[in-house]
Regions:
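N-terminal helix-turn-helix
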Residues: 1-87, 91-92, 99, 256-257
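Short, structured helix-loop boundary elements
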Residues: 13-17, 70, 74, 87, ...
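Short, conserved catalytic or interaction motifs in soluble domains
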Residues: 29, 127, 217
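A structural signal for short hydrophobic beta-strand segments in well-ordered beta-sheet cores
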Residues: 62-64, 111-112, 215
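Amphipathic alpha-helical effector-binding/dimerization core
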Residues: 72-168
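Cysteine/selenocysteine-centered motifs that mediate thiol-based redox chemistry or coordinate metal-sulfur cofactors
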Residues: 161-165, 170-172, 251-259
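Extended hydrophobic
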Residues: 177-251
Length: 259
């Protein structure tokens, strides 16, 4: 039934796949949407979108509210992400150490994994004593060029690879502090290499600073990173120096348990 529903649109399987995943991504980003809203957002006619939605409903990835007639993703999508995360042994290895780091620092700690030109949050520990919560979510991606974790990972790569990732990225001024010139960005990378840690000075989110370090995976390459994030009024330069010792210790603990 699924194949019949989508293949009536086009004989190009790549185009079919793109439309299906664009629909899923659109619903993930916007929440519940009506047929006309989706048609406009995806730039597809309503009959095409309707067939895609029916296919996704048949597979239990999308549900339609009987009262509003709007479409939204089902929890089956969450099940897929949970299955992926459950297969990642780095989460199990790092978890006790990032919990300890969060408890000792009193701040939110993230664990991310390199994902193309982005870093994806694969674990997060929020300190219970602080009421301010970060907008980050496990499963969400963040660009490498404007994040502490991204710079930490990139600093361990050759310059040519960094330039390639930069050119593939959609560089935009997310905040007034976002670095958008490659030469300036490479200066930050050099500073990260010298210090052994990276900073995010409100480059991705106004009012938030973070300190990050890379983590080597089983292949010996820096494909992970951890960070401590907090409102800037709790992240003075003096405190960052104190947090540096904590996060570098955690980096050593995690990597020592991998090899």
């Amino acid at each position: 039934m699924y194949q019949e529903a989508v293949m009536t649109d086009t004989k190009n399987p790549i185009q079919v796949s793109e439309r299906i995943f664009h629909t899923i991504e659109c619903l993930a980003q916007n929440g519940a949407m009506g047929l006309q809203e989706l048609s406009t957002a995806l730039d597809l006619n309503k009959s095409t979108v309707h067939r895609i939605l029916n296919s996704l409903i048949c597979m239990d990835y999308v549900r339609q509210d009987p009262e509003t007639a709007k479409y939204s993703l089902s929890f089956k999508i969450c099940g897929l992400s949970n299955q992926i995360l459950s297969q990642n042994s780095m989460i199990d290895i790092a978890r006790p150490f990032i919990k300890e780091l969060s408890a000792n620092s009193g701040e939110t700690v993230h664990l991310v994994q390199l994902d193309g030109i982005n870093a994806t949050y694969i674990d997060k520990v929020e300190a219970s004593q602080n009421s301010v919560r970060m907008i980050s979510m496990v499963g969400k991606s963040i660009p490498l060029y404007c994040s502490g974790v991204g710079k930490a990972i990139l600093a361990d790569m050759p310059d040519a690879k960094i330039e390639s990732i930069w050119k593939q990225s959609f560089i935009q001024q997310l905040t007034e502090h976002t670095v958008t010139r490659f030469v300036d960005f490479m200066n930050l990378i050099e500073e990260t290499r010298r210090s052994g840690y990276a900073l995010d000075n409100e480059e991705n989110e106004i009012g938030v600073r973070c300190i990050a370090v890379s983590l080597k995976g089983y292949n010996g390459k820096s494909t992970y990173a951890i960070s401590i994030s907090a409102p800037k009024d709790r992240m003075s330069d003096a405190r960052i120096l104190l947090l540096r010792e904590m996060i570098l210790k955690t980096k050593h603990q995690i990597e020592s348990n991998i090899y």
